[in-house]
């Protein structure tokens, strides 16, 4: 079956969602040899992935994942694809604490850096969060403090079967896209940054197929896989089962546009310092971009009417100390229970 479907991709035909799921199930069960996995990756990348293929692959990966149960009806993730090459600080990770500071349940999915100096796992580790916390403990932490970090390798062990092929081929493939679509806590509200403007609608449509309630998939025209405050941002909104795409400009949000260099980060230690400084209330462009992104996540969660309302709530969570309190609570909880 795998080889038949591979021939279909090679001939330039798109797969149905269930066909992609079948291929991924075979890969993630260890049934497929490395050369065939490499061929699958390369053929799909050459043809160009569709949103149905993306959803089909994500569905398989979700089924194989170690799941955690969260009692809240609203669970937010701010995990993006990464790979934008912009070398900014960890905007979406910092935003996650602000969202949690507004009383919204956050299950932040993430990993170590692939292409940047510092991934979400790297900065959280530098902040004192224990990464290798058992899923049951993470589940408990989300219930008790309202936020948890889901370190991808702890939940997606079946991905090990694809790793040799990924390392051998060395190209950006469908596997680079699946992280934000495979949250082990089943996050139903997302702010999802992507590395290419062509992916915003594709990811929003995939999230629709996967049953997300509301999501914003974003890409800054300056290349950021976040809502940018340096340039317009392309936004694909999934709401009430419909996807619509629009651009949003910094001035529409009453934010003073800045140069992207003002959002620069560094290694894990430097980025940890930036995150802490923002959550402690230091004003400036770095705090502004976090407020904008957290604000959008709050709209996705249904606790803010629009981006400006979300931004006001995000700013209040920083100024009141609630956002910093969530970081401190997560560090304490993982250190004591990890």
Curated annotation (Swiss-Prot):
Free-text cofactor note: Binds 2 magnesium ions per monomer.
Keyword Magnesium: yes
SUPFAM superfamilies: Nucleoside phosphorylase/phosphoribosyltransferase catalytic domain (SSF52418), Nucleoside phosphorylase/phosphoribosyltransferase N-terminal domain (SSF47648)
A Pfam family hit: Glycos_trans_3N
Residue sites binding anthranilate 1 per the record: 80, 111
Amino acids binding 5-phospho-alpha-D-ribose 1-diphosphate: 80, 83-84, 88, 90-93, 108-116, 120
Residues given in the record as Mg(2+) 2 binding sites: 225-226
UniProt-listed GO biological process terms: L-tryptophan biosynthetic process
Involved pathway(s): Amino-acid biosynthesis; L-tryptophan biosynthesis; L-tryptophan from chorismate: step 2/5
Keyword field: Amino-acid biosynthesis, Aromatic amino acid biosynthesis, Glycosyltransferase, Magnesium, Metal-binding, Transferase, Tryptophan biosynthesis
Keyword NADP included in the entry's annotation: no
Domain of life: Bacteria
Binding residues annotated for anthranilate 2, in chain numbering: 166
Catalyzed reactions per annotation: N-(5-phospho-beta-D-ribosyl)anthranilate + diphosphate = 5-phospho-alpha-D-ribose 1-diphosphate + anthranilate
Class of the enzyme per the UniProt entry, highest EC level: transferase
Binding partners and assembly: Homodimer.
Function, as annotated: Catalyzes the transfer of the phosphoribosyl group of 5-phosphorylribose-1-pyrophosphate (PRPP) to anthranilate to yield N-(5'-phosphoribosyl)-anthranilate (PRA).
Protein name from the UniProt record: Anthranilate phosphoribosyltransferase
Organism this protein belongs to: Desulfatibacillum aliphaticivorans
């Amino acid at each position: 079956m795998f080889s038949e479907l591979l021939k279909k991709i090679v001939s330039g035909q798109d797969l149905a969602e269930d066909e992609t799921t079948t291929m991924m199930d075979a890969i993630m069960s260890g049934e497929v040899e490395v050369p065939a996995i490499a061929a699958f990756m390369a053929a799909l990348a050459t043809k160009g992935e569709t949103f149905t293929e993306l959803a089909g692959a994500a569905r398989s990966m979700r089924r194989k994942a170690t799941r955690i149960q969260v009692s809240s009806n609203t669970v937010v993730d701010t995990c993006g694809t990464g790979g934008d090459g912009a070398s900014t600080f960890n905007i979406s990770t910092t935003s996650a604490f602000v969202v949690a500071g507004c009383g919204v349940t956050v299950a932040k999915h993430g990993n170590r850096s692939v292409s940047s100096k510092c991934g979400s796992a790297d900065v959280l580790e530098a902040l004192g969060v224990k990464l290798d916390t058992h899923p049951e403990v993470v589940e408990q932490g989300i219930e008790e403090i309202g936020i948890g970090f889901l370190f991808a390798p702890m939940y997606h062990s079946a991905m090990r079967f694809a790793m040799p092929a990924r390392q051998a081929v060395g190209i950006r493939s469908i596997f680079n896209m699946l992280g934000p679509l495979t949250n082990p806590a089943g996050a139903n509200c997302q702010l999802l940054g992507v590395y290419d403007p062509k992916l915003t609608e594709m990811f929003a449509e995939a999230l629709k197929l996967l049953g997300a309630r509301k999501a914003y998939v974003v890409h800054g025209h300056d290349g950021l896989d976040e809502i940018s405050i340096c340039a317009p941002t392309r936004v694909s909104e999934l709401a009430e089962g419909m996807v619509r795409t629009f651009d949003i400009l910094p001035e529409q949000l009453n934010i003073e546009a800045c140069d992207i260099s003002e959002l620069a980060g560094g290694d894990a230690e430097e980025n940890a310092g930036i995150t802490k400084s923002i959550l402690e209330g230091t004003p400036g462009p770095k705090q502004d971009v976090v407020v904008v992104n957290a604000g959008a996540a709050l709209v996705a969660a249904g606790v803010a009417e629009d981006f400006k309302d979300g931004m006001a709530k995000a700013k209040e969570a920083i100024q009141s100390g609630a956002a910093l309190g969530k970081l401190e609570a997560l560090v304490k909880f993982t250190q004591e229970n990890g």
